[in-house]
Structures are given as C-alpha cells and as structure tokens.
Amino acid sequence: MVVSVTDQKLLLVKDGKPVKSYTISTSKFGIGSKNGSNYTPLGQMQVARKIGDGYPSGMVFKSRRPTGEVLRPNAPGRDPIVGRIMWLHGLEAQNSNTFKRCVYIHGTPEEWRLGTPASYGCIRMGQKDVVDLYDRIGEGAEVRVMRGSLLETWEGQEFAKKHSPQMLQDYANRQIQTQQLQVSNPGVAKL
C-alpha cells in the first residue's frame, strides 16, 4: 500500500500492480513520529495486527475491543474507531514507535471529512472501504506513507493511466506551474 498525505489517498498495490484507490484522512496535526504528537508517521511500515473479523462495518471499537454499538456513516456526535483496525508497525528508525503509539488504519463514522487531514495520527477510511481493504490484505502487508503525491510513484502513475488520465494531466500542469514560479522568482523557495 502507498499512502499519500498530499493527496489524502491510499493506493492498494498487489503483486506490484496498483489495484484500487481509497480516499482517506491523515492527521490534522501534521506528519511525524514524536510520541504524544498525534502526527501521522512517514516511511515504511507493515500491518502488524488485524482486528475486527466478522463485525458489522460500523462496529465501534474501544481499546481495540468491540463495544456492541454500531454507527452509520456520518452519524452525528463523537468520532470513535469503527469497522476494522489494521495496527501499524514502523520498520524504520524514525517511525519505530508507530506500534507503541497505536497508529492504525481504521474506519470512521465521519466520512464527510475524508479527503482532508482530520485524524489524530491514524489513517481513517470510510466504513465500507476499510472492510474492503481489510479483506484484501493480510498481516505483514507493507505500507509506505509518503508526504508527496501518489503520482510521484510508479504505482500511482500506472493507476492514473488506467483509471484517471485527468489526474495525470492535472499533476503535469501543477509541475509546470511550479517550475515557472521558480524560474520567474529564483529567490522563492521550492513549493
């Protein structure tokens, strides 16, 4: 899997091929791995544990245990963890505390917030999407969380060619605009 903080997307990759894209939400506090920060960590990780087999997609979890309460998407009120939990383990020095920080890929009832940073460090997904992803992957699945666009990766470009050519064109236009800005304003830092 490749997660883009810029795009607020998760791209599922199976056998080296991009399969499906999901809209997600990363942390509203930013990116990083500092303990107690509520940041979304960057880098290489893997799914250490999967929790939620067989429960309804809106099942509320507290401390990774089902409460018996089931919420519909966009239910008013609080924002608990729902549906499924994929607990992440960092594989690099800078994100080695990811498991201890309890950073998950999980469902949210606040689906209207997907596509914008809204979490407290986890990677949030829609209720149906998190069940779909959960069913497609196993423990040990690789996850790469990156700051940049999915289109900066081979997998993202391949997915866009097949499913969203306009996405490729928009990305190319942004790259051209950035280059033009740098040429016309050489003292301005790179965007």
Residue ranges of predicted features:
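A structural motif detector for short, solvent-exposed N-terminal "entry" segments of globular domains
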Residues: 1-30
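Well-ordered beta-strand positions in beta-sheet-rich domains
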Residues: 21-23, 44, 102, 142
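Structural motif
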Residues: 7-9, 44, 85
